[in-house]
Amino acid sequence: YVVGDPLKELYSNCGLFVLPSHTEGLSLSLLEALSIGARCLVSDIPENTVVTDIYGAAFKPEDTDDLARALERECTQEYPDAMRQQQIQYIHTNFEYDVMLDRYEEVYHHVVGDPLKAMTKKKKKGRVPAGAKA
């Protein structure tokens, strides 16, 4: 089990992060790889492509020929540093812990109804409500 700086070092040194899963929720490892600036190739399932439609590439799940073509394509294309920096910023802006926590709270408040709405109006130390600018 690797965390912290050693994990960042691994992601920053990978030429291409490949996630071939066909049944998975939003992958923490995918978010980690993207947040470090790694190029990512994922199976074309909504849980992956919700994150990689802009920064990343996908292949058809369980289609080894499509995976092979995607691997060849991604390994031969350049990935400009400017794009990598945009990717890092996008992930930090949209998927940081505090942002995701605010989004989960919004869903819970929406499901439960009015009693919890007052809680969303209180300023939470260190957090900006989803969609708001810091």
Predicted regions and their residues:
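Short alpha-helical segment that forms part of, or immediately flanks, the ligand-binding pocket
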Residues: 8, 27, 31-35, 46-50
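Short hydrophobic beta-strand element within catalytic cores of glycosyltransferases
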Residues: 39-42
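Aromatic "clamp/platform" in nucleotide-sugar-dependent glycosyltransferases that forms part
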Residues: 20-22
